[in-house]
Amino acid sequence: MAPKIPLNVIFLGTDEFSIPILRKLIGCVQRVRVVSAGGKRQSRRGEIPLPPAAMEANANGLEYIKLQDGWKNFHMRPDDQLAITASFGRFVPFKILNQLPYGGINIHPSLLPKYRGAGPVYSTILNGDRLAGVTIQTMDSKQFDKGKSLAQAYLKLNGKETYTLLTKILSLGAAGMLEHVLLQSLYLPNCQTNTVAPQIHGRITDTGGLQLISKETFPSFQESWAKKITPEDAHVNFESMNTQQIYNMSRAFNHVWCILNNKKVFLYDVHPLHSTSAEDWIHMKPGEFALLEKNLLLVKTLDHVMVIKGGIRLSARKIVDPVEWGKTFNSGRGGRFQYV
C-alpha cells in the first residue's frame, strides 16, 4: 500500500456525489475532517436524517461537523491545511479559506466554464448533451465556480443516462482525478500555472474509470449557466413538448408531472415507445393516454408516443402500477393529461 499524502483535509460535502470522493480521500491522505449541512426531512413528521456524507464519516470513524446557524459551530484546528468541497452547496467564507495554508479546491460536475451554478448534471441531461464532465478548481473567495482550473475530465454520453447513474459515474471519475491533483501537489500555489487551461486532462469511462489524455485532444466549451432546479422543471406539457424533451425530463428527475381531473399526477420512468406500429396510436391527441393490448400504458406527445413504465402517483398517494391503474381509471377507456 502506498504511503498516505501528509495532508490534513477539511472535506465539505453533502449528497451521494461526495461519497466516492470522500472514500478516495480516506485512502490517500493523512487526515480528513468532514463538514456537512443538515439532511432533508423525508416526511412532515419524520426526523431529519443525516446526509450521505455524514453517514460515510460515521462509518469510517471520522470527525464530523454538522453546520448549524451558518458557520457558528465550526472551529478550525491548528493543523488544518486544505479544504475540499464536493456538492456542498454553500459558500466557504473567506475567513476560513484565508486561515488554511493551501486554501481550498472545489470539485464541480461540469466542464467549466460550461454550466457554472447549482444544477449542472440536471442541465446536462435536460439539454440532451452528448458530453458531461468534472472540473477540479481552486476556490474563489468571492464567487462560485470562478477559481483556477486544475484538472478536467469528460464523459461521452449515450443519451440514456439517468441523474442517479450519471452522478455516480462522474463522482467516481472525479475521485480518480482528485488523487492525481493531490499526488502532483497542484493545490500548492507554486505548482499552479498562470494559464486558464487545466494541467490535468482526462476521459471518464462509462464505469467511472479515468484515463489521462493530452490537452490537445481535449474539447473546449463556451461559458453557460446551470440554473437552480425547482419542481416546475418536471412539469410536462404533452401538447407542446416533443418525445425527446419529455424523455430528458424523465431521465433527469425520474418522473414528470401534469394535471388530471384538476389534481397533480406524477408519471415515473417515461420512455419513448419504439416497438409498435403507428396505427396503434396515430389517432390519439397529445396528452391522451390509453392501454395498448392491456400491457402498456401509452401517452401521446407532440410528435410520437411514450410508455409509462415506473408507475403513477396521484397527489399524496402511493405509486401504483401504470397498467393496473390504466385498467381501473375511467373503466379502462383512457383519458387525457393536461398541463393546467
Curated annotation (Swiss-Prot):
Compartment(s) where it occurs, according to its Swiss-Prot or TrEMBL record: Mitochondrion; Mitochondrion matrix; Cytoplasm
Enzyme class: transferase
Keyword vocabulary terms for this entry: Cytoplasm, Mitochondrion, Protein biosynthesis, Transferase
Catalytic activity of the protein: L-methionyl-tRNA(fMet) + (6R)-10-formyltetrahydrofolate = N-formyl-L-methionyl-tRNA(fMet) + (6S)-5,6,7,8-tetrahydrofolate + H(+)
GO MF assignments: methionyl-tRNA formyltransferase activity
Pfam families: Formyl_trans_C (PF02911), Formyl_trans_N (PF00551)
InterPro entries, alphabetized: Formyl_trans_C (IPR005793), Formyl_transf_N (IPR002376), Formyl_transf_N_sf (IPR036477), Formyl_transferase-like_C_sf (IPR011034), Met-tRNA-FMT_N (IPR041711)
An annotated GO cellular component: mitochondrial matrix
BP term (GO), one: mitochondrial translational initiation
Enzyme Commission number: 2.1.2.9
Family as reported in the entry's similarity comment: Belongs to the Fmt family.
Purpose of the protein: Formylates methionyl-tRNA in mitochondria and the cytoplasm. Responsible for the formylation of the N-terminally formylated (Nt-formylated) mitochondrial matrix proteins that are encoded by mitochondrial DNA. Nt-formylated proteins in the cytoplasm are strongly up-regulated in stationary phase or upon starvation for specific amino acids and are targeted for degradation by an E3 ubiquitin ligase-mediated fMet/N-end rule pathway. Increased Nt-formylation of cytosolic proteins appears to be important for adaptation to these stresses.
Protein's name in the database: Putative methionyl-tRNA formyltransferase
Protein source organism: Schizosaccharomyces pombe (strain 972 / ATCC 24843)
